[in-house]
C-alpha cells in the first residue's frame, strides 16, 4: 500500500499546461478507493480562488485517507496542496505532506518558471535543495486542472498527450493515449467518457506500463469518474463518489 495514494492523485492529475478556465472556485470532487474487494479509503479535491504573490491563483487541496479495515492495519493521512497560476496554468507553490504506515514525507516546493528552476524544502529536517527543471513542469495537482482545461480537439481517439510531472526531487515523463469513447456507469447514472491509458512506470508500483485505465467525462469538465490500476500486488479502483460546484453540467442519464 506504500505510496499508492500518492499515485492515485497522480493518475487523477497527469496532463500538460494551459490557461485554467474550466474550473469554478468552490468545486469539490470526492473519490472512493477500493483495494481489491476492500473499501480502502477516500480522496477529496477542493478548489478555491486566492491571490498569491499579487496574482490570481487556484488553491487546490487534495486529502487522502484510508478507511475501514484497511485503516486498521495501514493508516494513511495525506495532504497535498498546489497554488496554480490561473493565467498560465503553472504551479507556483506545492505541498506534499503524507503519512502512510511508516512512510513519512513533508515537502514544500517553490517554482520559478522564468528560469526553469525550483526550490524543494524538506520540512522534516528543514533542509532545502535547488533543482533545474524544464519548461512547463507540473506538480501532481496542477496537472489535473490543466487536463480539464485542454481543448476537446486534443482528446481525439488515437491522440497522445505527453507531459512531465515533478514528484519530490525528480521529474517523471508520462504519456496519455486516448483509446476510445465509452459510456460509463456510475452511482449517479451513465455518462459518456473518454477512455484513456496513461503509460506509467512499471516495476515499482504497477505491473506494466499499460496497467492503468482511466475514464474522464467527454465534455468541457473532463472530470475523472473512474480509475483502475493493476498493481504488483492486487488491484486498485477509484470511483467518483461526490461532486459539487462543477462549472459545466454533468449529463448523467438514469
Summary of predicted features, one role per range:
Residues 19-113, 152-254:
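Acidic, serine/threonine-rich low-complexity disordered tracts
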Residues 105-150:
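Hydrophobic, well-structured mid-protein blocks that either form specific transmembrane helices
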Residues 13-15:
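N-terminal signal peptide c-region/cleavage motif recognized by signal peptidases
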Residues 1, 18-19:
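Absolute protein N-terminus
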